[in-house]
């Protein structure tokens, strides 16, 4: 065997060694590349060798650190060709694109409602299960979403860190500020595919869409009457509890609905 044949055989052997799958000794999972196995094994060891110089957060992969650093730099390299909106990660861009395409791959097994994002489906499913995993340490009130708990906690602290540059109004969460700013800009990015009506908030669009579908997700536990909105169920439930939270400061009379209080106050104004 000459030197060129030996060299070819050695090269062929290295290719075969590289292609041979590597097995994780902890969980038995196979990987085609040794580097992928090395990254995977950090899950078992809890090893996070890539450290953010800005805040000290640690990561298992260099790619995860690179993605995280965009929080500090504000870099958003992934741009939507439809609306020019930009994002920090490709995954978020893919989710955003479904707003334009109308694709909703995540479907609820209970009611068939579909969503463009997996987290939206998980949040929705809590309507059916009644699960409220996020609990306030101050008052014990529980919530189905972490963002609702965060917003609620600011009701105890009074913190409103998000301020409108146009009018100075402050809010306890950034989403509320973004929604408010659409009053000034006139932007209504959420459009009904049935009738073309546009809304400033996605939640308003979701509620509106139920007028077309007839869907009523919110059910009274006392009389089983159903409603399209949680707010309507809450108002209805006061019939059973007798609660009248809206009090007239003029005469002390109380009402179940704010609209009833307003009508009553006009009687005083006309006196």
Swiss-Prot record:
Keyword Zinc annotated: yes
GO molecular function, a single term: RNA polymerase II cis-regulatory region sequence-specific DNA binding
Short name of any one Pfam family annotated for the protein: zf-C2H2
A GO cellular component annotation in the UniProt record: nucleoplasm
SUPFAM superfamilies assigned to the protein according to its UniProt record, in alphabetical order: beta-beta-alpha zinc fingers
Keyword Metal-binding tagged: yes
Subcellular location: Nucleus; Nucleus, Nucleolus
Residues spanning the signal sequence: none
GO biological process: Golgi organization; regulation of cytokine production; regulation of immune system process
Zinc finger residue extent: C2H2-type: 22-44, 50-72, 78-100, 106-128, 134-156, 162-184, 190-212, 218-240, 246-268
Family matches, as PANTHER family: GASTRULA ZINC FINGER PROTEIN XLCGF26.1-LIKE-RELATED, ZINC FINGER AND BTB DOMAIN-CONTAINING
UniProt function note: May be involved in transcriptional regulation. Essential for Golgi structural integrity.
Family the entry assigns: Belongs to the krueppel C2H2-type zinc-finger protein family.
Protein name: Zinc finger protein 501
Organism per entry: Pongo abelii (Sumatran orangutan)
